[in-house]
Amino acid sequence: MTAPDGRSQKLAELFDALGAGVIEEYAEFIPEGAPADSVQKLYGGKSTLVRGTQRKQVTFAFGAEFVEVRINTRTREIRVPRLVGAFTAGRIMNTRTARSQLMSGLVWGMSSALLESTEFDAASARTVNRDLQDYLVPVNADVEDVQVIMLPEVDSFANPAGVKGLGELGNVGTNAAVANAVYHATGKRIRALPIRLEHLMD
């Protein structure tokens, strides 16, 4: 790590000097030209943080995710019997692979909402759950009804072929949809992922 004055030191030495195994950093970005309190107002729902210019036509791919949850009243175990995603992404070149990409994204979003978490040992800064024995991911028994709806779209503004990237479109809103479904079922607004049993205990 190099300081502005040119001095440098190895990260391992800094960790040792601090007596800490983990360093966390939190940062906020305020677009150029926006007032300094824009982010705080945005958090409070008092303003919309909009900056930058773009052509008049919006050419992004879009999706909306819907989730049904069942929560055991005794154990607070959360199950997801149904995932539905509706997507529009321009001209689809290969329906089969596009559907598979979106379906796996829905499952991944559910996984990040309820299971996945990288755990660190604070003393050594080493990953505790570094293999699939300890890092939780969904298995077939965790995935029930997954429905992908692909809406037709002709977009000649995006590019001459009218195609758009799917990428991670399937998982973008899924964990938020899971959290909203949990809130609807329990009245508890959970703002940290993954949502664990202890978050739902009274």
Located regions from the model:
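C-terminal catalytic domains of large/alpha subunits in multi-subunit enzymes
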Residues: 1-202
